[in-house]
């Protein structure tokens, strides 16, 4: 199982919208969110709000067999939830998930687990 943590800056003034977006996925749109992630091959996704002096960031942790496939699938999907999700990400983060990310995916340097 592969994992990834990635940070997305939240555009100025969009933090409350990001919180509402997250609440939508945890609440009224949870079944659509879950179906989307299962369809994309994810097994876990956690989003954190990180407040910094430079601005707020969403830090997303995910697990899947094929992380690049998750991004590719999400970028191409025409499922209504995935289209809505991409629109929210573009509006809140300024990131167009229909296009390749503007750089390589983050590289893990340490991975400690209790045994």
PLM regions and their residue ranges:
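An amphipathic, aromatic/His-enriched active-site/gating alpha helix that lines ligand/cofactor pockets
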Residues: 31-43, 64-103
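Long, hydrophobic N-terminal alpha-helical segment
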Residues: 1-30
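N-terminal low-complexity, charged segments
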Residues: 20-43, 47-50
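Local beta-strand/beta-hairpin segments that build beta-sheet-rich folds
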Residues: 98-115
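Short, well-ordered beta-strand segments in beta-rich or mixed alpha/beta enzyme
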Residues: 5-9, 18, 45-76
């Amino acid at each position: 199982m592969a994992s990834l943590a990635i940070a997305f800056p939240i555009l100025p003034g969009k933090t409350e919208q990001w919180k509402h977006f997250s609440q939508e996925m945890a609440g009224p749109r949870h079944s659509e969110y879950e179906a989307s992630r299962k369809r994309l091959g994810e097994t876990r996704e956690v989003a954190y709000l990180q407040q910094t002096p430079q601005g707020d960031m969403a830090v997303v942790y995910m697990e899947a067999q094929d992380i690049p496939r998750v991004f590719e699938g999400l970028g191409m999907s025409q499922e209504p939830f995935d289209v809505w999700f991409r629109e929210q990400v573009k509006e809140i983060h300024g990131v167009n998930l229909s296009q390749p990310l503007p750089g390589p995916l983050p590289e893990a340097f340490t991975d400690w687990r209790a045994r």
